[in-house]
Amino acid sequence: MATKKAGGSTKNGRDSNPKMLGVKVYGGQTVTAGNIIVRQRGTEFHAGANVGMGRDHTLFATADGVVKFEVKGQFGRRYVKVETV
């Protein structure tokens, strides 16, 4: 009969998969319509002109142009817009 002491238990040993969030296109870079600009959880950045927001708060370009980030308003909200050329 094999004699092996039973192994203990642990509460560690797991991790979640990476979500690949963040800014994908920076200010001054060109985009085409449909390009993802920011992937985020919640509205860390808000959609400005020529930018749409997906159901997971992803910001994407709705027109071709150049990306511009700006801070506006009383609460310092960060907006992303696409300026058409």
UniProtKB/Swiss-Prot annotation:
<dbReference type="InterPro" id="IPR018261">
    <property type="entry name" value="Ribosomal_bL27_CS"/>
</dbReference>
<dbReference type="Pfam" id="PF01016">
    <property type="entry name" value="Ribosomal_L27"/>
</dbReference>
<dbReference type="GO" id="GO:0022625">
    <property type="term" value="C:cytosolic large ribosomal subunit"/>
</dbReference>
<dbReference type="GO" id="GO:0003735">
    <property type="term" value="F:structural constituent of ribosome"/>
</dbReference>
<dbReference type="InterPro" id="IPR001684">
    <property type="entry name" value="Ribosomal_bL27"/>
</dbReference>
<keyword id="KW-0689">Ribosomal protein</keyword>
<keyword id="KW-0687">Ribonucleoprotein</keyword>
<protein>
    <recommendedName>
        <fullName>Large ribosomal subunit protein bL27</fullName>
    </recommendedName>
</protein>
<comment type="similarity">
    <text>Belongs to the bacterial ribosomal protein bL27 family.</text>
</comment>
<feature type="region of interest" description="Disordered">
    <location>
        <begin position="1"/>
        <end position="20"/>
    </location>
</feature>
<dbReference type="GO" id="GO:0006412">
    <property type="term" value="P:translation"/>
</dbReference>
